[in-house]
Regions:
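Helicase P-loop NTPase motor core
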Residues: 20-23, 28-119, 141-145, 212
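Conserved helicase C-terminal RecA-like lobe
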Residues: 91, 105-117, 130, 137-341
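Conserved helicase NTPase motor core
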Residues: 1-14, 29-33, 224
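Flexible beta-alpha connector loops of hexameric P-loop NTPases
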Residues: 1-5, 25, 69, 317-321
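Switch/connector loops and helix/strand junctions flanking conserved nucleotide-binding motifs
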Residues: 1-3, 33-39, 46-47, 53-54, ...
Length: 341
């Protein structure tokens, strides 16, 4: 499952051919999961042709059957997960929710927060804390409130538009000298500084966005993405994980579509962020990708997004090797569960 880090399953499959004197020991006795969970996991992985034959045998006999739930969409799926966890009750750290892509965490975070259930994103950051999401939220906050100096500083040169630290320092100096808020100083600098074309373009962009703040939030963000060519910036700045970041952007658009307007959307974001504040990891539901779940175990595991395009992922279904990697990921997810899946 670590092929994205250049791991190759052939190193395992061809081991005895490369080292004919080697002896193979199969560790097949499983102390973690119940018989029902292992039977389900084995039924998944047995479909793989490229594997060493091995069937886990449970120490824990019996157990409840694995439950399957078919949701109408991702929002209803997140609602079901949150309601089930609320029904089963604390301690919250006995639950894990596993998914294929980082972007899937957003609805889960919001559904759990809406029921007052503390959660944490393991091996990553919460959806609204991801850099590309924070960039777009900063534009929204600035459009609604030009006095938001923190948001102004974040987006001033994101994507890069030729406004460097030296220019920003001069704007701040102007603000101090004239007793102006940074945004007003920036507008004056755009009028009076030499070679201020980048500043003028930025001011015009923000004023364009201000005209959209009372309309649909999704339309605001779509205009922003087009006006800044933000997707192209992500592809150029983050070639290794641009697709993951673009998925987060698409998820943000889906979230924006649910809000009445931009202010309503930012209020919802603030509520989710507030619900994620409580401290100790021990008392929280674990949200994580299947890759981050390797080696961990939980009494109760939810595996979400088991559907064509997500698991198996759309980038992996065109080859046998890719499809089998996806099946291994599903197997890893199922076998994280100790009692219920």
């Amino acid at each position: 499952i670590y092929s994205f880090r250049a791991a190759d399953i052939k190193n395992i499959l061809d081991f005895t051919r490369d080292y004919p004197e080697a002896r193979v020991y199969r560790l097949e006795e499983n102390y973690r999961s119940t018989e029902a969970i292992l039977r389900f996991a084995n039924a998944v992985i047995v479909k793989n042709a490229l594997r060493l034959a091995r069937a886990l045998r449970p120490v824990k006999r019996g157990g409840e059957p694995v439950r399957l739930y078919r949701a109408e969409d991702a929002r209803e799926e997140a609602r079901f997960v949150a309601e089930e966890i609320a029904r089963l009750g604390p301690p919250w750290d006995r639950y894990a929710v596993l998914y294929r892509t980082n972007a899937q965490s957003r609805l889960l975070e919001q559904a759990l927060a809406g029921r007052g259930i503390p959660a944490r994103v393991v091996g990553g950051v919460g959806f609204f804390e991801r850099a590309e999401v924070k960039d777009l939220l900063a534009y929204a906050r600035l459009a609604l409130n030009p006095l938001d100096a923190v948001s102004l500083k974040r987006v001033l040169n994101t994507p890069p538009r030729g406004i460097g630290p030296a220019t920003w320092a001069r704007v701040q100096l102007l603000a101090q000298e004239k007793g102006l808020p940074p945004w007003e100083a920036l507008k004056e600098a755009a009028r009076t500084f030499p070679r201020a074309e980048p500043l003028r373009h930025f001011v015009a962009l923000v004023e364009e966005l201000q005209d959209l703040v009372f309309g649909p939030a999704e339309a605001f963000f779509r205009h922003l993405l087009e006006a800044t060519d933000y997707p192209a910036y992500l592809r150029e700045a983050y070639p290794e994980d641009a697709e993951d970041r673009l998925e987060n952007v698409e998820e943000l658009l889906r979230a924006a579509k649910e809000a009445e307007d931009l202010q309503d959307f930012l209020d919802r974001v603030a509520l989710t962020a507030k619900a994620e504040e409580p401290a100790e990891a021990e008392g929280r539901v674990a949200l994580m990708t299947l890759h981050n779940a390797k080696g961990l175990e939980f009494p109760v595991v939810f595996l979400v997004g088991v559907e064509e395009g997500l698991l198996p992922h759309r980038n992996s279904v065109s080859t046998l090797e890719g499809l089998e990697e996806e099946r291994r990921l599903a197997y890893v997810g199922i076998t994280r569960a100790k009692r219920h899946a």
